[in-house]
Amino acid sequence: MKYESSFKSEADGLEISVMALIPDKKPYRAVVQLVHGMSEHKERYIPFMQYLAKLGYVVVIHDHRGHGKSVKHQDDLGFTYGGGAQAMLQDIRTVNRKIHAYYPELPLILMGHSMGSLAVRAFVAEHDSCVDMLIVCGSPSYNTAMPLGVAIAKTETACLLYTS
């Protein structure tokens, strides 16, 4: 069963959109709290959430501020309303607390993808007792080949400008 709701962010009162998929049958195995990446939204994860729910996991995800439905206006996509990373971490904490309130007996698995992987690492650094398992995937990192890519891009740009 799919539930959608929202809560007012403790950081600044912004409405944060949340979705949960609940398995049809009990007992539930655990709760998976998903934390999405930059320029994503919670609906992108529905097929993955359905898969986990079929395996017996309760799955909860929220749209980060400035993403999906966690905006005041569609033109605001990408803007965090001044709250920045600290407000995003506070929103993750609010969702985490609500999960613990609804499912105190279940283990909580926190999973972050891409920008979400950076967020969950920062979250766990301060709130490790709130998580039973951490899954970090698609973490951004420095690519040693980046200077070569930048040089190629500059060369191609120069060639395009020269031939125009």
Model feature map: region roles:
Residues I135-T144:
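Active-site nucleophile loop of the alpha/beta-hydrolase fold
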Residues S117-D128:
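Short glycine-enriched nucleophile-adjacent loop
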Residues Y81-H100:
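Alpha/beta-hydrolase active-site loop
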Residues M1-P23:
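N-terminal cap/lid segment of alpha/beta-hydrolase-fold proteins
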Residues G37-E40:
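Active-site glycine-rich loops that stabilize anionic/oxyanionic intermediates
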Residues A53-H73:
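Conserved alpha/beta-hydrolase
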Residues Y103-H113:
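Alpha/beta-hydrolase fold nucleophile elbow
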Residues Y162-T163:
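Conserved small/polar residues in nucleotide/adenosyl-binding loops
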